[in-house]
């Protein structure tokens, strides 16, 4: 049955409609100027010269990573054939909370690329020691390297009112590495959605970085159609009905010309067809996939919550998940002690019951849950409490929250969490 289902898939090569797949240059659409500029700058490596620092900026899904990665891969292959070791070390700064985490992430990437031990502890070691290990790896394994700092504007770090964002320090240190710390050639490519990014760098980082600017604009509907046409061979022959690509590109054009969303939607439409046992992807599959995307979008808002709000929501979702089978409700009288347990586990500051409830109610404005004020009447001395009801599977919300590295640690405490929840339920005789 499994083999039969695989044979009947609408996909020939599903990877081609994965948004982060590195594709060949001949599949790149509507980015001739940007492609020429990236090629012109990176090809300096082929003459064993250092490429300049680069700043690629523009809205999400406009081809920044796609173009840089496609060119860098080709340059690396050519260099390797010539006996010259060129590498790119990429980190996404979205979930990195500090300069120290960013430097460790670069060490980890270098060690993985070179098949070496990381060689430095993640915690309990100074950032300076991590830099030293990074530079040792670079000296041992490369002749030239480009640090690719994706979503660099999100690396703010733990700032006081007078301190600079962490990305200023990181860019300053990396852009000076080949001058002060190591013998190989080092460049920095910063990728950001923020066109004002350079205005936020401190003066020394701006002077040291001094990048070549490469702006990216939104794709229009015609370009999005061409992008999807160039990936049509991800599907078996005649698997796409005529209206699928125009409709998919139209939905994506409404989302500010984001090619990543267009590709993602086309893949999801194919998945819907597979799930339904259909051998042709139709307009209806696209519309169903778009509805799923819009539902998922509200969950993505959860990812942007502060840590305290995430812990509050996680505690409430856990109470609902560990309740009766199919339960989607959680009492604040149970959820708040669970929140206190979780803050202890994470060694995080605890907030008052009122603040906790304010956090959870705020999440309700994102379409995740509703709340209702209830009275205990004569039970347990009376009083009021809130009953939260989730609009979707609380387990799904927990999994989304666990994408945060810190919250992910809570998944290792499921048994203890369940015991606390059941004990609190017994205390308040609530289900």
UniProtKB/Swiss-Prot annotation:
ATP binds at residues 62-66, 219, 231. GO terms for biological process: DNA replication. CDD domains: Cdc6_C (cd08768). Keywords: ATP-binding, DNA replication, Nucleotide-binding, Plasmid. The keyword Electron transport does not apply. One of its GO terms (molecular function) is ATP binding. Involved in regulation of DNA replication. HAMAP family: ORC1_type_DNA_replic_protein. This is ORC1-type DNA replication protein 14. It comes from Haloarcula marismortui (strain ATCC 43049 / DSM 3752 / JCM 8966 / VKM B-1809) (Halobacterium marismortui).
């Amino acid at each position: 049955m499994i083999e039969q289902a695989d044979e009947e898939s609408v996909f020939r090569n599903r990877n081609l409609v994965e948004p982060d797949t590195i594709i060949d240059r001949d599949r790149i659409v509507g980015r001739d100027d940007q492609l020429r500029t990236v090629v012109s700058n990176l090809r300096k490596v082929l003459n064993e010269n250092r490429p300049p620092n680069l700043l690629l900026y523009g809205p999400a899904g406009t081809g920044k990573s796609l173009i840089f990665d496609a060119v860098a891969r080709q340059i690396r292959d050519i260099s390797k054939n010539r006996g010259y070791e060129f590498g790119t070390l990429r980190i996404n700064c979205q979930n990195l909370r500090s300069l120290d985490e960013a430097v460790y992430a670069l060490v980890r990437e270098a060690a993985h690329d070179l098949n070496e031990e990381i060689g430095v502890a993640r915690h309990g070691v100074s950032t300076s020691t991590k830099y030293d290990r990074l530079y040792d790896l670079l000296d041992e394994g490369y002749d030239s390297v480009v640090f690719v700092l994706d979503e660099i504007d999100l690396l703010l770090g733990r700032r006081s009112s007078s301190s600079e964002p962490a990305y200023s320090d990181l860019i300053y240190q990396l852009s000076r590495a080949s001058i002060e710390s190591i013998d190989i050639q080092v460049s920095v490519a910063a990728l950001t959605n923020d066109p004002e990014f350079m205005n936020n760098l401190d003066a020394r980082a701006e002077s040291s970085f001094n990048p070549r600017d490469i702006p990216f604009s939104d794709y229009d509907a015609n370009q999005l159609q061409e992008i999807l046409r160039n990936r049509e061979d991800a599907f078996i022959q005649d698997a796409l009905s005529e209206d699928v690509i125009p409709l998919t590109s139209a939905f994506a054009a409404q989302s500010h010309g984001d090619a990543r969303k267009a590709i993602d939607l086309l893949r999801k439409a194919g998945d819907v067809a597979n799930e339904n046992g259909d051998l042709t992807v139709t307009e209806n599959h696209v519309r169903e996939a778009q509805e799923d995307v819009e539902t998922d979008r509200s969950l993505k808002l959860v990812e942007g919550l502060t840590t305290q709000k995430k812990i509050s929501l996680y505690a409430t979702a856990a109470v609902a998940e560990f309740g009766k089978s199919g339960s989607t409700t959680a009492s604040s009288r149970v959820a708040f002690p669970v929140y206190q347990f979780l803050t202890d586990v994470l060694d995080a500051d605890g907030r008052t019951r009122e603040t906790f409830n304010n956090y959870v109610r705020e999440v309700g404005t994102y379409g995740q849950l509703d709340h209702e004020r209830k009275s205990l009447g004569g039970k347990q001395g009376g009083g009021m409490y809130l009953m939260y009801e989730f609009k979707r599977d609380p387990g799904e919300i927990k999994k989304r929250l666990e994408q945060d590295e810190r919250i992910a640690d809570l998944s290792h405490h499921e048994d203890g969490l369940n015991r606390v929840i059941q004990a609190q339920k017994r205390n308040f005789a609530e289900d």
